[in-house]
Amino acid sequence: MESFARLLIAIPLVSYVLAVLSLWVGLQINSFIFPIAVCISVLWECSDKRIRGCVRWTTIVAVLVVLSVTLGLSACIYDRSFDGQWYHACTIRELVNGWNPIHSSACSPTPIDGYTVLWVEHYPRGIETIAATIVSCMGNLDAGKALNLWFVFSSIVYIYLFLCHCLPTMNKYLRIWIALVVALNPVVINQMCTYYIDWTLYTLSVSYTHLRA
């Protein structure tokens, strides 16, 4: 279970590192970054000697299935949020269309109004950068929202493992229920299918609790 959650977090984080490195050397975000990130993360997981072979491959297959299903669902679900449609999606679109924020402060590939430019150029864009690698690969602007589901799924698993470690005598179903309640708070549920990012720090912080246990 832990390797499943670890992979779901590793893939977007590796995508982010590759995207930033590409931008830093003067390249653009392209359709190869996300598949390469998946391959690197899977190879890294395969190299873990602590995991038995059958468990390792079962985990990898499960993660690939989750990636496929969530990408398909996200591509079909339209982001109806205000900020999600506005500067979040605009930032992703600019990155996909060739904007390099490291070497160019102006969003030049496509014309956008001055007020939106202020948000696109100066708002932190970590999640948007990861989403842009997904969108560039999938060719669908809404597909990047799958990232939300990966982080949420991993947080559920990590909370469950945290409870297993700290409260080993607790009923298994009660642990599952608590993990779902903690991971799926109202903000997370409301923003899970949008490009809002208010939930991100909470979800990653919750996942971090298992590492500190």
Model-derived regions, located:
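Transmembrane signal-anchor helices characteristic of membrane glycosylation enzymes that use polyprenol
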Residues: 58-83
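Loop-to-helix entry region of an early transmembrane alpha helix in multi-pass inner-membrane enzymes
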Residues: 121, 125-128, 137-157
